[in-house]
UniProtKB/Swiss-Prot annotation:
Entry-linked SUPFAM superfamilies: ADP-ribosylglycohydrolase
Statement: the UniProt record of this protein carries the keyword Cytoplasm: yes
Pfam family, one: ADP_ribosyl_GH
GO biological process, alphabetically ordered: cardiac chamber ballooning; cardiac myofibril assembly; protein de-ADP-ribosylation
Record-stated family: Belongs to the ADP-ribosylglycohydrolase family.
Full protein name: Inactive ADP-ribosyltransferase ARH2
Annotated keywords: Cytoplasm, Phosphoprotein
UniProt signal peptide: none
A GO cellular component entry from the record: sarcomere
GO-annotated molecular function: ADP-ribosylarginine hydrolase activity; magnesium ion binding
InterPro entries named in the record: ADP-ribosylarg_hydro (IPR012108), ADP-ribosylglycohydrolase (IPR050792), Ribosyl_crysJ1 (IPR005502), Ribosyl_crysJ1_sf (IPR036705)
Cell compartment(s), UniProt: Cytoplasm, Myofibril, Sarcomere
Record has Cell membrane as a keyword: no
Length: 354
C-alpha cells in the first residue's frame, strides 16, 4: 500500500518540479536548468509549497481519473460516465495550469447528460498530445494484476480517447497504465517496452470491436508502434535476449536535449503520447534508484518536463517508495492527503475482484 501511495504522491512531485521549469520561458535547455538548481542548493533543500511549486493539469486530471476509479461502479460503462463527470467538473480549473490543448478540447466534447454516448468524442487530428498518458497511470494501479490485462486495455483506451481521440494520444494512456501495472507486478524494467508493444495489437482489436473511427485510426496507428520499436532498437532492448539498455558514452544534458527532440514529432521532447512515456522510461532505465538522476533526466529538460516528470515520478514511487526522496519535496505538496488517500483506496480495490 505504501508504494501505491508513493506512486500517486511522486507523480505529483515530478509534475510540480517539471511544471515550474515549463513555466520559466527562458529555461529551455536542460544544462541551464540544472545549473540554476545547483545554485539554489539542489533537490535536498527544496520545499515544494503549493504557492511556489503548483502542480499542472497533469495532476488535476490524474486525480480526477483516480477518483472515478475509486467509486463503486457496477460496470465499465458506469466507470466511463463517472470519468466524464469528473473531467467536466474540473475542466474550468485547467486553463490557468497551461494544459495540453487537446485536453481542453476533448473535455468540451464530453456529454455528461447523454447516458449512452457520454464518453464518445469525435476523432481529433490534433489529439496526439501527452495529456492522455499523464492522467492514466492510476489505471495501472487499479488493474495491475496480469489477469486484468483485458480490462486495463479497455479502460486505458476509453479514458485516453475521451480527451485524445487519436492513436498517438490514447496509446500513450495504454502505455503508462501498462508500465504502472508492470511495476506493481515486479516485472524487470528492461522488459516493459517490448511487453507494452505486445499489448498494442490487443488495443487495436478492442478499437475494431467498438467500431469507432476505424479508418482514421488505421491511418495513424503505425506511428506510435514504429517510434517505440526504433527506441527499443536504439537502446538494444528490443529482443527478449537483450536485457541491458545501452546508452551513448556522452549523454549529458545537452545530448539528451538533442535526443529527446529527435524522438519527438515536433522538436519538443515529451509533447506527444509516444514520447512523454518514452523519456520517462529512458530516465528510469538510466537512473536506477537515484531520484536525483531521475530528476535531471525527466523533470529538468527543455521539453514538456511536467508531463515526463509526472510519469517518471509515479513509476519511481511504485518501484522504490518514498525513502530515497527528500522529504521537503512531498511534505507540503499540493493535495498531498488526497493523493495518498487515492493511492490507498486503489490498493485496496485492486486486491478485490471486480
Amino acid at each position: 500500500m505504501e508504494k501505491f501511495k508513493a506512486a500517486m504522491l511522486l507523480g505529483s512531485v515530478g509534475d510540480a518540479l517539471g511544471y515550474r521549469n515549463v513555466c520559466k520561458e527562458n529555461s529551455t535547455v536542460g544544462m541551464k536548468i540544472q545549473e540554476e538548481l545547483q545554485r539554489s542548493g539542489g533537490l535536498d533543500h527544496l520545499v515544494l509549497s503549493p504557492g511556489e511549486w503548483p502542480v499542472s493539469d497533469n495532476t488535476i486530471m490524474h486525480i480526477a481519473t483516480a477518483e472515478a476509479l475509486t467509486t463503486d461502479y457496477w460496470c465499465l460503462d458506469d466507470l466511463y460516465r463517472e470519468m466524464v463527470r469528473c473531467y467536466v467538473e474540473i475542466v474550468e480549473k485547467l486553463p490557468e495550469r497551461r494544459p495540453d490543448p487537446a485536453t481542453i478540447e476533448g473535455c468540451a466534447q464530453l456529454k455528461p447528460n447523454n447516458y449512452l454516448l457520454a464518453w464518445h468524442t469525435p476523432f481529433n487530428e490534433k489529439g496526439s498530445g501527452f495529456g492522455a498518458a499523464t492522467k492514466a497511470m492510476c489505471i495501472g494501479l487499479r488493474y495491475w494484476k496480469p489477469e486484468r490485462l483485458e480490462t486495463l486495455i479497455e479502460v486505458s483506451v476509453e479514458c485516453g480517447r475521451m480527451t485524445h481521440n487519436h492513436p498517438t494520444g490514447f496509446l500513450g494512456s495504454l502505455c503508462t497504465a501498462l508500465f504502472v501495472s508492470f511495476a506493481a507486478q515486479g516485472k524487470p524494467l528492461v522488459q516493459w517496452g517490448r511487453d507494452m508493444l505486445r499489448a498494442v495489437p490487443l488495443a487495436e482489436e478492442y478499437c475494431k470491436k467498438t467500431i469507432r473511427h476505424t479508418a482514421e485510426y488505421q491511418e495513424h496507428w503505425f506511428y506510435f508502434e514504429a517510434k517505440w520499436q526504433f527506441y527499443l532498437e536504439e537502446r538494444k532492448i528490443s529482443k527478449d535476449s537483450e536485457n541491458k539498455a545501452i546508452f551513448p558514452d556522452n549523454y549529458d544534458a545537452e545530448e539528451r536535449e538533442k535526443t529527446y527532440r529527435k524522438w519527438s514529432s515536433e522538436g519538443r521532447g515529451g509533447r506527444r503520447g509516444h514520447d512523454a512515456p518514452m523519456i520517462a522510461y529512458d530516465a528510469l532505465l538510466a537512473a536506477g534508484n537515484s531520484w536525483t538522476e531521475l530528476c535531471h533526466r525527466a523533470m529538468f529538460h527543455g521539453g514538456e518536463s511536467a508531463a515526463t516528470g509526472t510519469i517518471a515520478g509515479c513509476l519511481f514511487g511504485l518501484l522504490y517508495g518514498l525513502d530515497l526522496v527528500p522529504k521537503g519535496l512531498h511534505q507540503d505538496l499540493e493535495d498531498k492527503e488526497k493523493l495518498e488517500d487515492l493511492g490507498a483506496a486503489l490498493y485496496c480495490l485492486s486486491t478485490e475482484e471486480k
